[in-house]
């Protein structure tokens, strides 16, 4: 009798262990995939309203974007070859492939350029003379545009130290290793470290558009060009000048290194903040200056650009961009065109479906024909088999 009881206990124990080891999902609607779901049956009648609604929404938005883009007035001068093509003693018309402009009125004088060379320092300045044919009442912005510069590489994007930018005096191995190979030089800390800071755009734009003849000068400012959301990322540094050195590519800006008087204040250096916000695409614009208080008067102006940034090393270009803005920022023709294309495609398919429904309807696709509960007609299996598969689908 005892043997029988022990055998039953072992059998019950083994059955419990098997139940515990079972990989069968729980008997619930979610685990057994019995949740209720809506599977819409798409037909021309149901899709037509959606296409018409899509066209009605996208078309006005696209038209508005295109109109706002057309209202943007701009001048774009690619000055990459200014040092090679521009004369040194007089102005010369800029070749058409380096210029693009759009104003409300026709330009009478084509943009011109010349290059000036400092005999002592050897610095070169590209001087651009251009005409504004009409008074611009809107705010005016100056951007620089770079092409073929990939700021979106992972190694490049991560090459900074956030704590150092906030002002902490980090040294040696305390710096983020992503700053390598630009963390230290001869036991001195590079401030700011990393590839992003080292490659900062350093062509210098004059803050005054000098008027020619009776045209008044137009003043621009670098204040307020950075995003307010970036202000918390930067602070006044705690470094001593003797402990740090500038990045290698800043040698021209700080020829004798740092002193107690010239350590950059990243908290208030807005051009630096603009550059540190990396671009997603290889061709991008970055704001350099602006004037949001006074309009730009009609006349001829001169803009001076000190040439420092070597774009030829990465087969890129650099451009001077003078522009107004629209409700979506600078002119963006592609966005409005994309909206219009989507609206056009929706309209085209809506028309095709409407023609299909009117001239060649398919009554068997009416949902009322799918109810066979009250049907008195006997089911004919042979008729179903004879229907081609493409007709059933």
From Swiss-Prot:
Cytoplasmic side stretches: 1-46, 356-393
Transmembrane region(s): 47-67, 335-355
Entry's localization field: Golgi apparatus, trans-Golgi network membrane
UniProt keyword terms in alphabetical order: Disulfide bond, Glycoprotein, Golgi apparatus, Membrane, Transmembrane, Transmembrane helix
Alphabetized InterPro entries for the sequence: CDC50/LEM3_fam
Membrane-protein topology: Multi-pass membrane protein
Sections of the chain in a coiled coil: none
Recorded superkingdom: Eukaryota
Region (Confers specificity for binding DNF3): 70-332
SS bond partners: 82-126, 179-193
Listed GO biological process terms: phospholipid translocation
Glycosylation sites: 78, 123, 187, 202, 213, 240, 291
Residue ranges annotated as Lumenal topological domain: 68-334
Assembly mode: Component of a flippase complex consisting of DNF3 and YNR048W/CRF1. Interacts with DNF3; the interaction is direct and required for proper expression and endoplasmic reticulum (ER) export of either partner.
Miscellaneous note of the record: Present with 4510 molecules/cell in log phase SD medium.
PANTHER family (UniProt xref): CDC50, ISOFORM A, CELL CYCLE CONTROL PROTEIN 50
Record function comment: Accessory component of a P4-ATPase flippase complex which catalyzes the hydrolysis of ATP coupled to the transport of phosphatidylcholine and small amounts of phosphatidylethanolamine from the lumen to the cytosolic leaflet of the trans-Golgi network and ensures the maintenance of asymmetric distribution of phospholipids. May be involved in transport from early endosomes to the trans-Golgi network (TGN).
UniProt protein name: Phospholipid-transporting ATPase accessory subunit CRF1
Gene source species: Saccharomyces cerevisiae (strain ATCC 204508 / S288c) (Baker's yeast)
């Amino acid at each position: 009798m005892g043997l029988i009881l022990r055998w039953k206990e072992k059998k019950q124990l083994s059955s419990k262990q098997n139940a515990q080891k079972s990989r069968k999902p729980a008997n619930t609607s979610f685990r057994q995939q019995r949740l209720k779901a809506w599977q819409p049956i798409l037909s021309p009648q149901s899709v037509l309203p959606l296409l018409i609604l899509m066209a009605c929404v996208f078309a006005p938005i696209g038209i508005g974007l295109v109109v706002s883009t057309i209202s943007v007035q701009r001048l774009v001068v690619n000055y990459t070859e200014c040092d090679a093509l521009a004369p040194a003693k007089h102005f010369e018309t800029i070749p058409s492939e380096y210029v693009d402009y759009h104003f409300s009125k026709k330009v009478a004088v084509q943009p011109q350029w010349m290059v000036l060379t400092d005999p002592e320092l050897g610095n070169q300045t590209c001087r651009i003379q251009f005409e504004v044919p009409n008074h611009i009442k809107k705010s005016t912005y100056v951007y620089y545009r770079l092409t073929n510069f990939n700021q979106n590489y992972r190694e490049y994007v991560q090459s900074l130290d956030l704590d150092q930018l906030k002002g902490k005096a980090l040294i040696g191995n305390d710096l983020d290793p992503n700053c390598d190979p630009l963390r230290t030089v001869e036991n001195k800390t590079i401030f700011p470290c990393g590839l992003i800071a080292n490659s900062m755009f350093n062509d210098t734009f004059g803050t005054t558009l000098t008027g020619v003849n009776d045209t008044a000068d137009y003043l621009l400012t670098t204040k307020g060009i950075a995003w307010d959301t970036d202000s918390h990322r930067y602070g006044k540094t705690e470094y001593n000048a003797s402990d740090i050195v500038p990045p290698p590519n800043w040698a021209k800006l700080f020829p004798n290194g740092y002193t107690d008087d010239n350590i950059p204040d990243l908290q208030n250096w807005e051009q630096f903040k603009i550059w540190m916000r990396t671009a997603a695409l290889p061709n991008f614009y970055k704001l350099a200056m602006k004037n949001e208080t006074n309009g730009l008067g009609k006349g001829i102006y001169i803009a001076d650009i000190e040439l420092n940034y070597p774009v030829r090393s990465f087969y890129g270009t650099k451009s001077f961009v003078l522009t107004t803005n629209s409700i979506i920022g600078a002119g963006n023709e592609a966005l409005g065109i994309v909206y219009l294309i989507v609206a056009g495609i929706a309209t085209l398919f809506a028309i095709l479906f409407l023609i299909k429904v009117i001239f060649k309807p398919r009554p068997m696709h009416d949902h009322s024909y799918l109810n066979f509960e009250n049907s008195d007609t006997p089911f004919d299996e042979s008729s179903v088999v004879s229907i081609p598969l493409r007709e059933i689908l």
